[in-house]
């Protein structure tokens, strides 16, 4: 269900602000988005997997908080990230 380490590393390279950046808001949001998409596919196939559904809701809430933080601190970076990830905002 969780994304592979290779895929996570690719995402980190793409959205990193500098070399070795693994914790910036952009990287965290991008990794969470990939996780959310994977979990969403799993939930569609396994509708009664309520534990995974709860994990999905927690990840969505965490991403929402990070997006709000990024929007409040740097609107331009927020808009670029939302556009590149294809989030509806």
Swiss-Prot record:
Domain of life: Bacteria
InterPro entries: Ribosomal_uS15, Ribosomal_uS15_bac-type, uS15_NS1_RNA-bd_sf
Gene Ontology molecular functions: rRNA binding; structural constituent of ribosome
One Gene Ontology biological process: translation
Keyword annotations: Ribonucleoprotein, Ribosomal protein, RNA-binding, rRNA-binding
SMART domains: Ribosomal_S15
GO CC term, one of those recorded: cytosolic small ribosomal subunit
Pfam families in the record: Ribosomal_S15
PANTHER family: RIBOSOMAL PROTEIN S15, BACTERIAL AND ORGANELLAR, SMALL RIBOSOMAL SUBUNIT PROTEIN US15M
Family statement: Belongs to the universal ribosomal protein uS15 family.
Main function: One of the primary rRNA binding proteins, it binds directly to 16S rRNA where it helps nucleate assembly of the platform of the 30S subunit by binding and bridging several RNA helices of the 16S rRNA. Forms an intersubunit bridge (bridge B4) with the 23S rRNA of the 50S subunit in the ribosome.
Subunit structure comment from the entry: Part of the 30S ribosomal subunit. Forms a bridge to the 50S subunit in the 70S ribosome, contacting the 23S rRNA.
Xref: NCBIfam families: S15_bact
Name of protein: Small ribosomal subunit protein uS15
Lineage: Bacteria, Bacillati, Bacillota, Bacilli, Lactobacillales
